[in-house]
Swiss-Prot record:
It comes from Aquarana catesbeiana. It comes from the Eukaryota. The keyword Secreted applies. GO terms for cellular component: extracellular region. Antibacterial activity against Gram-positive bacterium S.aureus (MIC=130 uM). Shows no detectable hemolytic activity towards human erythrocytes. One of its GO terms (biological process) is defense response to bacterium. Keywords: Amphibian defense peptide, Antibiotic, Antimicrobial, Secreted. Belongs to the frog skin active peptide (FSAP) family. Temporin subfamily. It is found in: Secreted. This is Ranatuerin-8. Expressed by the skin glands.
Length: 13
C-alpha cells in the first residue's frame, strides 16, 4: 500500500 494513499485515506476518514 502506498504511504501517500494511506495519508489521503487517513485525512478523509
Amino acid at each position: 500500500f502506498i504511504s501517500a494513499i494511506a495519508s489521503f485515506l487517513g485525512k478523509f476518514l
